[in-house]
Design a protein with these regions (language model features):
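Transmembrane alpha-helices and adjacent helix-loop boundaries
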Residues: 1-316
């Protein structure tokens, strides 16, 4: 039962990462938007869900005590709204400058979470967040299993919706903007509008992943907003296959599996004097996996599929 409980826990966390990776895939994989502030929008979603669903805190804002599903919707809306405000002045920036700008936004969000204690309680965090199905399940294992089913259902709904979107004319326009923004603009396509749309929608999915995380763990604090989260999501997308939604999901499961496995293996192999270096060594190992993947299979485990319009397929 312990192994099964851990497997369910592992898959829930991998699913939460998969939702964030799908959001990044929409931005970077399909549109070429270099968003290095993934963890910032994840944090906005997590705190929004905590405010909407959490108990009344005497020393902080929030405590509406609404159903977690309401929290998930609110997290997507608020994260998307923040992305819209951020994207208006920054989305025109080129790759390097946009990466710096989004990274700076993520750092600002973390600093706000750390220092605005009347709203976030600082490092004390927002606690006692409700988990869906916990009361009806009867046991922690059953509650986690029900949560896993819900996360898988959300992933399938999001993936099917994204697949339908990227196969549409709008999806082909995303690829056109990604490949050559200037040529797309010359053909009458509003590249700024397209990039802003995908930035908002992708950030909304990142906010949803934060909400799922907050209600699963029952706690959120600035410690959950570390830049390593963004690194993990990028590695997941590169390994799984940029531009492929199913590849994004596969990459999330594979990299999270390697991330957790390396911690167990390194803890067993390293001598006691080096146990404090397990986290650093693990990051190095995952970085080496990323480099190897870029050298040996840059298209990822599941490469991007060619998308041809029906009209083009009918031409001789």
């Amino acid at each position: 039962m312990d192994v099964l409980s851990y497997l369910v826990f592992f898959l829930v966390v991998a699913g939460i990462y998969a939702v964030a990776t799908l959001g990044l895939n929409l931005q970077w994989g399909f549109t070429g938007i270099m968003n290095v502030g993934v963890v910032g929008f994840f944090g906005v979603g997590a705190y929004t869900a905590a405010y909407v669903t959490g108990p009344n805190y005497p020393d902080a804002f929030g405590g509406f005590g609404l159903h977690p599903l309401v929290g998930y919707l609110a997290a997507m809306v608020v994260s998307g709204a923040v992305a819209f405000v951020v994207g208006l002045p920054t989305i025109r920036l080129k790759h390097d400058f946009l990466a710096i700008g989004t990274f700076g936004i993520a750092i600002c969000i973390q600093l706000v979470a750390m220092n605005w204690k009347s709203a976030t309680r600082g490092f004390d965090g927002l606690h006692s967040l409700p988990k869906p199905f916990a009361a009806a399940a009867g046991s922690p294992f059953a509650a986690n299993l029900a949560y896993l089913v819900m996360v898988v259902a959300i992933i399938l709904l999001v993936t099917l919706a994204l697949e339908r979107m990227v196969r549409s004319p709008w999806g082909r326009m995303l690829r056109a903007v990604r490949e050559d923004e200037t040529a797309s603009a010359a053909l009458g396509k509003d590249a700024f509008r397209v990039r802003l749309q995908t930035f908002v929608m992708g950030s909304g999915l990142m906010g949803l992943s934060g909400a799922l995380y907050a209600n699963f763990t029952g706690f959120v604090s600035p410690q959950d907003l570390l830049p390593i989260f963004t690194f993990q999501v990028f590695v997941m997308l590169v390994v799984g296959g940029s531009g492929n939604n199913w590849g994004a999901i596969l990459g999330a499961v594979v990299i999270w599996g390697l991330w957790t496995a390396t911690e167990t293996v390194l803890s067993a192999l390293l001598p006691p004097g080096l146990q404090q270096q397990v986290a650093a060594v693990r990051i190095v190992m995952v970085g080496l996996i990323l480099v190897a993947m870029l050298l040996l299979r840059p298209q990822g485990l599941l490469p991007e599929r060619r998308n041809v319009s029906p009209e083009a397929r009918l031409k001789p």
